[in-house]
Amino acid sequence: MLDFFTIFSKGGLVLWCFQGVSDSCTGPVNALIRSVLLQERGGNNSFTHEALTLKYKLDNQFELVFVVGFQKILTLTYVDKLIDDVHRLFRDKYRTEIQQQSALSLLNGTFDFQNDFLRLLREREESSKIRAPTTMKKFEDSEKAKKPVRSMIETRGEKPKEKAKNSKKKGAKKESSDGPLATGKAVPAEKSGLPAGPENGVELSKEELIRRKREEFIQKHGRGLEKSSKSTKSDAPKEKGKKAPRVWALGGCANKEVLDYSAPTTNGAPDAAPPEDINLIRGTGPGGQLQDLDCSSSDDEETAQNASKPSATKGTLGGMFGMLKGLVGSKSLSREDMESVLDKMRDHLIAKNVAADIAVQLCESVANKLEGKVMGTFSTVTSTVKQALQESLVQILQPQRRVDMLRDIMDAQRHQRPYVVTFCGVNGVGKSTNLAKISFWLLENGFSVLIAACDTFRAGAVEHVRTHTRRLSALHPPEKHAGPTMVQLFEKGYGKDAAGIAMEAIAFARNQGFDVVLVDTAGRMQDNAPLMTALAKLITVNTPDLVLFVGEALVGNEAVDQLVKFNRALADHSMAQTPRLIDGIVLTKFDTIDDKVGAAISMTYITSKPIVFVGTGQTYCDLRSLNAKAVVAALMKA
């Protein structure tokens, strides 16, 4: 039984609605519009909202949306066919009113579709009871067939040619063992007395003849080669003198006194740092203002300059033919027209480090958006699809919620409490380093920071954060801010409960008047249940204002797995009624990937959370805010 069925325009006018079991369809339909239609996530034609499953169909020619809702515990096999039938009948019956495409005509139009809909619903329900014999799904219809081609996968190991040769050798050995030449040594056809021809049952290909000639050569000259190889090995020098180790600029020293960190330390203001290290670690640029991410390179500037120069080789005739080539006319797009272009776009996205499943969903969303749409006069299919994909990518990188830390910190100051930020992520992604960058950015904006060392698992984690605190304190001494200490470290050593340390740090910050508390947590893999339980406990007990997931820009499919499992673990291990999930993303090591920026798309698409910061280097000033248009331009670059 259906809960509701509604037809509305993309402008928001409800043309017709059928109310079944549900009292109102406003809430589910509004959730569909906010979460799917406006966010360009139409790759799948179904959407789940609370206890309902919504299926929808877009009519891009007349700018209509058809939505049906039913209980998600039900399996209604006729829903897809029902939407197609209703779409076809409604469009044909009210074509005149719809073609005017004006709000006044749609408001004045009378869409009496109740009897027709009930008739179609009755027919679909009766036809679903008569079950047709089930047929096996073809490989082309499976999910595996939709995944990228094998040519996009770079495998390590032996080359394909070598594998083909080995398989041919194995096949030839089997044939020789089964035939009349099954002896200890491979004997050529000429010596065996049997002519190589089909009449004697021996048909040799060109590859087999070459292989047999090679075996004869190895049998004759193999012993000499083995002796020569042994002699060359024995003549080699035994061992050279050891190379002197290279001394790096910031490599430190190996003195025992310098490396001894076992002395007891106390919380509070850190010691002063050497000035030469400070000048190197700060970097250049304004620290208090986040600059937009710039993904352009020198190659892009050269191509832009070359494109701006007029080409003297092309004449008026070539320009006329180019104009006629782009002349397509008012054509309605179909899936067959877009199939080849979408395949190329999907492979291009995967090559730029977008996760394979997300690339498929993006292309499917673009196909649903453009199917039935009338193209412009001078537009081609490729340009239309590319423009629609660019618009979808920009929309994905601009999610619903925008995180403004400075505004939220000022709001927390008015309530006389510290603003708490928790960093989480897998091992080695740069949580502590980017925590220090964000600390420097906050210090440049005049906020005092308390760093809570809650990584009690990794050896050297507390010393790592202490080093950053010492350098940040040297960059912002108390004299620079008229007395008060701007940055301090709160730590309780190793092996303690991280949730308890974070709670004590927040209480200490409230008593001492700190503006921000940055909580550094231990790196953990997404499948490590004990550590994920400890992270969920830390977030549930302390209720931070912001939970940031730190991820690398180097990963592809792994980004989706990490974010999905982190959110799932936080929800499963949380003791709260409404579990706290990830609020934002910090994308690190962005300076190492050139134009393969697909991880930004994968992370934002799978979580619908914004990328708050982007790490672009190893100094404190190497922190950027995400520029969606620059990322999309780098992603679409050939």
Curated annotation (Swiss-Prot):
Membrane topology: Peripheral membrane protein
Compositionally skewed regions (Basic and acidic residues) per UniProt: 137-146, 153-165, 218-239
Disordered, as annotated region: 129-205, 218-245, 262-315
CDD domains in UniProt: SR_alpha_SRX, SRalpha_C
One of the GO biological process terms: SRP-dependent cotranslational protein targeting to membrane
A GO cellular component entry from the record: signal recognition particle receptor complex
Residues engaged in binding GTP: 425-432, 520-524, 588-591
Protein keywords: Endoplasmic reticulum, GTP-binding, Membrane, Nucleotide-binding, Phosphoprotein, Receptor
Molecular function terms from GO: ATP hydrolysis activity; GTP binding; GTPase activity; signal recognition particle binding
Main location: endoplasmic reticulum
Sequence positions bearing Phosphoserine: 177, 296-298, 473
Keyword Cytoplasm: no
Family under the similarity heading: Belongs to the GTP-binding SRP family.
Function description: Component of the SRP (signal recognition particle) receptor. Ensures, in conjunction with the signal recognition particle, the correct targeting of the nascent secretory proteins to the endoplasmic reticulum membrane system. Forms a guanosine 5'-triphosphate (GTP)-dependent complex with the SRP subunit SRP54. SRP receptor compaction and GTPase rearrangement drive SRP-mediated cotranslational protein translocation into the ER.
Free-text comment on this protein's domains from its UniProt entry: The NG domain, also named G domain, is a special guanosine triphosphatase (GTPase) domain, which forms a guanosine 5'-triphosphate (GTP)-dependent complex with a homologous NG domain in the signal recognition particle (SRP) complex subunit SRP54. The two NG domains undergo cooperative rearrangements upon their assembly, which culminate in the reciprocal activation of the GTPase activity of one another. GTPase induced rearrangement of SR drives SRP-mediated cotranslational protein translocation into the ER.
Complex and partners: Heterodimer with SRPRB. Interacts with the signal recognition particle (SRP) complex subunit SRP54.
Name of the featured protein: Signal recognition particle receptor subunit alpha
Source organism (scientific name): Canis lupus familiaris (Dog)
Lineage of producing organism: Eukaryota, Metazoa, Chordata, Craniata, Vertebrata
